[in-house]
Design a protein with these regions (language model features):
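Nucleotidyltransferase catalytic core that binds NTPs
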Residues: 2-234, 243-245, 275
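Phosphate/ribose-recognition catalytic cores of enzymes acting on nucleotide-derived substrates
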Residues: 219, 224-279
């Protein structure tokens, strides 16, 4: 496995692999890898000749009061995991390598106005910009994203379609702990008490799934989910919403495929979870 830190050396490797006719898969990450990331890397390995993992804490997707400096980092552990999973390259640039003197950004209207975009207004602009850069640097045939970040996945798919990137976007299932908590790098922030409290998210998901399968109206589904979360004293709801699975706009009834998503603060840590329902 190789490690690169510059755009130039990464492009050189990619160019050689392309000359050899090899397919390239990209797994974009912010590092501090867990089993959720590992599942993406395994899938990428199954479907491509070359596996590239980007390990970059992207500053442009963090707001001024968010956890950029506190975000967990452990590149040694990340590289060992990637090597054990058969990755061919980790691209691990410094921020100044990715952003010299930036004036151009990529943003997606409408899809980024709801859910996480409502309370994190610059987040998806930063995500789309860095993912576009990675696509241009690595030129992958396929790129892999987890469905835990369902809004991000929808936005990236739309960006790829609208900007004519010749890349297949592969969404992969949410990976959970044995007790149901969705895997997240931010779980490391939680104290033992908060870790226990965080299970209200997966309980709310289960409650919502059961309710929606019974044909209960959208607002009642959300009300039941909110009640589960509000019963936990350490939890503070950012949002619990039901949106159209394609355009991320709120819906009042379940007449087409929907995404039911939530963001909840457990203490100071913001966690997300979701489920999809297909009509």
């Amino acid at each position: 496995m190789q490690v690169t830190t510059t755009v130039e050396e990464t492009r050189k490797l990619v160019k050689n692999w392309k000359k050899e006719g090899k397919t390239i898969g990209l797994v974009p990450t912010m590092g501090f890898l867990h089993e959720g990331h590992a599942s993406l890397i395994r899938r990428c390995h199954e479907e491509n000749d070359i596996v590239v993992v980007s390990d970059f804490v992207n500053p442009t997707q963090f707001g001024p009061t968010e956890d950029l400096e506190a975000y967990p980092r452990d590149f040694k552990r990340d590289s060992e995991l990637c090597e054990s999973l058969g990755a061919d390259l980790i691209f691990h640039p410094e921020p100044k390598e990715m952003y010299h003197d930036p004036h151009a950004y990529v943003s997606i209207d409408t899809l980024s106005d709801t859910l996480c975009g409502k309370t994190r207004p610059i987040h998806f602009k930063g995500v789309c910009t860095v993912v576009s850069k990675l696509f241009n640097i690595v030129a992958p045939d396929r790129a892999y994203f987890g469905q835990k970040d369902a809004q991000q996945l929808a936005i990236i798919r739309k960006m790829v379609q609208d900007l004519n990137f010749d890349i297949q976007i592969v969404g992969c299932p949410i990976i959970r702990e044995e007790d149901g908590l969705a895997k997240s790098s931010r779980n490391t922030y939680l104290s033992a008490e908060e870790r226990k409290a965080a299970l209200c998210l997966s309980r709310a998901v289960k409650t919502g799934q059961e309710a929606i399968c019974k044909g209960i109206k959208a607002e009642e589904v959300l009300s039941k989910m909110r009640a589960v979360i509000e019963a936990e004293p350490l939890a503070k709801i950012d949002y619990v919403s039901m949106v159209d699975a394609l355009d991320m706009q709120p819906v009042e009834s379940v007449e087409k495929d929907v995404l039911v998503a939530m963001a909840v603060y457990i203490g100071k840590t913001r966690l997300i979870d979701n489920f999809s329902y297909e009509v």
